[in-house]
């Protein structure tokens, strides 16, 4: 049997788990940039494909039965370009790290951490302190937190927010009972009723037809003017033009954006995440889609991927199956 690890993240995964794979499994690694000379034969021979992308213009892969993503999303894998019956599995283990990020930026924003630290470092200013009876900053306690997408990540965000004495609401595409500390889980179609109540909105939902452009200009206008928006879902969940206008014009107070509308490629390895200059806005925390990229997450994900490949080789039931084509 043969497994093809395709792309930079997959190559790193292969290095991390190779010693845990069956000796009879042949492993081929094609790192970035993809070697188009080696790819046709590698694709033709592989029963397992480990990658976060596969395109229709790639060579045929007639024997592939398992597509193991190295990420949570499989939207860059064109399953229609693979054999019928293929199982597509994702990799998780990122929930706790991403939830920590959400709580971190929520606290940093409410406590004006970056602004106050920079001012004190650069100017030695005490104007935000009790020493000069300065203007106090906020706190998370007593605020209303709205979580859009009450799945693995959303539930972890809620669990971490409970000790801060927030009022917690959520919205989800499918019915789900609230865990302790969560006041209500709205159907996603009722999100318009939730947004005006929230001081903080965290987007954790998967990207799909129902959620593409979910947060548009109209829904941004429903949010409170002092609201803070955190996107740890996918860039396309928010209308790019609408959120830039809302932040530029301060119709909402601020945002933390970890996911984007465009990503680096071979031609532009340091490509900005948007056609708009979000990085120039002082009310936006920007990070390069790394909220879940922790050492602990990498190890957890490697364990899951190795386990799934071993299950496949042994003919056992797979884990984290998200699609069958």
Residue ranges and their predicted role:
Residues 99-118, 162-166, 303-316:
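Oxidoreductase and adenylate-handling cofactor-binding alpha/beta cores
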Residues 55-62, 79, 210-229:
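Rossmann-fold NAD(P) dinucleotide-binding segment
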Residues 54, 71-72, 199, 205-207, ...:
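Short glycine-/small-residue-rich Rossmann-like dinucleotide-binding loops
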Residues 226, 232-325:
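Rossmann-like dinucleotide-binding domain for NAD(H)/NADP(H)
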Residues 39-42, 57-60, 193-197, 219, ...:
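Structural alpha-helical scaffold elements that stabilize or flank donor/cofactor-binding regions
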Residues 1-48:
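N-terminal glycine-/charge-rich "phosphate-binding" loop or analogous flexible N-terminal tail
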Residues 44-122, 137-138:
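Phosphate/diphosphate ligand-binding glycine-rich loop within oxidoreductases
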Residues 133-225:
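Rossmann-like dinucleotide/phosphate-binding beta-alpha-beta segment
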């Amino acid at each position: 049997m043969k497994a093809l690890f395709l792309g930079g993240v997959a190559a790193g995964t292969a290095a991390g788990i190779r010693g845990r794979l069956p000796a009879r499994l042949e492993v081929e690694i094609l790192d970035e940039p993809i070697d188009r000379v080696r790819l046709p034969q590698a694709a033709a021979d592989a029963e397992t494909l480990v990658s976060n992308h596969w395109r229709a213009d790639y060579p045929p892969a007639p024997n592939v039965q398992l597509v193991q993503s190295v990420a949570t999303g499989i939207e860059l894998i064109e399953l229609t370009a693979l054999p019928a019956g293929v199982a597509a599995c994702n990799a998780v283990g990122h929930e706790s790290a991403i939830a920590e990020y959400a709580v971190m930026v929520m606290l940093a924003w409410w406590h004006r951490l970056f602004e106050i630290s920079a001012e004190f470092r650069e100017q030695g200013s005490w104007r935000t302190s009790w020493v000069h009876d300065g203007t106090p900053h906020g706190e998370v306690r007593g605020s209303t937190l709205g979580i859009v997408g009450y799945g693995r990540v959303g539930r972890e965000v809620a669990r971490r927010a409970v000790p801060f004495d927030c009022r917690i609401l959520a919205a989800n595409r499918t019915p789900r009972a609230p865990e302790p500390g969560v006041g209500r889980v709205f159907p996603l179609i009722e999100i318009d009723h939730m947004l005006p109540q929230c001081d903080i909105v965290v987007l954790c939902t998967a990207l799909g037809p129902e959620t593409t452009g979910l947060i548009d200009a109209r829904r941004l206008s429903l949010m409170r003017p002092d609201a803070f928006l955190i996107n740890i879902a996918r860039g396309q969940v928010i209308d790019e033009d609408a959120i830039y206008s809302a932040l530029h014009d301060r119709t909402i107070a601020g945002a933390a954006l970890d996911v984007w509308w465009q990503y680096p490629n071979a031609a532009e390895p340091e490509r900005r995440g948007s056609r708009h200059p979000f990085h120039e806005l002082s009310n936006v925390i920007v990070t390069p889609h790394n909220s879940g990229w922790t050492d602990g997450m990498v190890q957890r994900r490697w364990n899951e991927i190795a386990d799934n490949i071993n299950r496949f080789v042994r003919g056992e039931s797979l884990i984290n199956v998200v699609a069958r084509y």
